[in-house]
């Protein structure tokens, strides 16, 4: 789940949900 935190912190929460 480290990648999720990195993406969410880099692009934002919306990006994390889109990736998931």
UniProtKB/Swiss-Prot annotation:
Belongs to the peptidase C13 family. The keyword Transmembrane does not apply. The lineage of its organism: Eukaryota, Metazoa, Spiralia, Lophotrochozoa, Platyhelminthes. InterPro entries: Peptidase_C13. Its EC number is 3.4.22.34. This is Hemoglobinase-like protein 1. The keyword Heme does not apply. It catalyses: Hydrolysis of proteins and small molecule substrates at -Asn-|-Xaa- bonds. One of its GO terms (molecular function) is cysteine-type endopeptidase activity. GO terms for biological process: proteolysis. It comes from Fasciola hepatica (Liver fluke). Keywords: Hydrolase, Protease, Thiol protease. It is an enzyme of class 3 (hydrolase). It comes from the Eukaryota.
